[in-house]
Amino acid sequence: MISNFLKSNNIKNNSPFRSFCTRYSESHEWIKFNHRNKTCTLGITKYASDQLKSIVNINLPDLNSTITRKQPFGNIESTKTVADLFSDVDGKAVLLNSDVIVDPTIVSHSPEDKGWLIKMESNDFESFNKMMTKSEYGQFLKDINKSNV
């Protein structure tokens, strides 16, 4: 019964009864959504971190800033380039990872754990559910690698 509900509402492998679920964007950010308290944690993927190489500076939004889906909310500067940061969900910044602001190399070493960037309040489950699952993101990366050969 639940699986029929999920299929009919186009919810990808995301039981509404799970507390945490992580999704990935085409711009190589990840979002871990806590459905119970309607917060999410956002960071960049290992792939993005590897592409940037040496991260030297991170600019994040002010606390309580509105984060608009698909609009830049900050950037990461490396020795190679400056890359904008995007969220695939709307929300409000409620916590910034001050550790990565002081020591940006944390993102290089632990992009999907200690290198998280911001925590947001969000009710944007619909946009979150449109993001890629881990397996879909893995296939997305394989397709990128094929096109770069």
From Swiss-Prot:
CDD domains: GCS_H. Residues 39-121 form the Lipoyl-binding domain. It comes from the Eukaryota. GO terms for cellular component: glycine cleavage complex; mitochondrion. The keyword Protein biosynthesis does not apply. GO terms for biological process: glycine decarboxylation via glycine cleavage system. The modification N6-lipoyllysine is found at K80. Its cofactor is (R)-lipoate. Keywords: Lipoyl. Binds 1 lipoyl cofactor covalently. It holds the Pfam family GCV_H. InterPro entries: Biotin_lipoyl, GCV_H, GCV_H/Fam206, Single_hybrid_motif. The glycine cleavage system is composed of four proteins: P, T, L and H. Belongs to the GcvH family. The glycine cleavage system catalyzes the degradation of glycine. The H protein shuttles the methylamine group of glycine from the P protein to the T protein. This is Putative glycine cleavage system H protein 3. It comes from Dictyostelium discoideum.
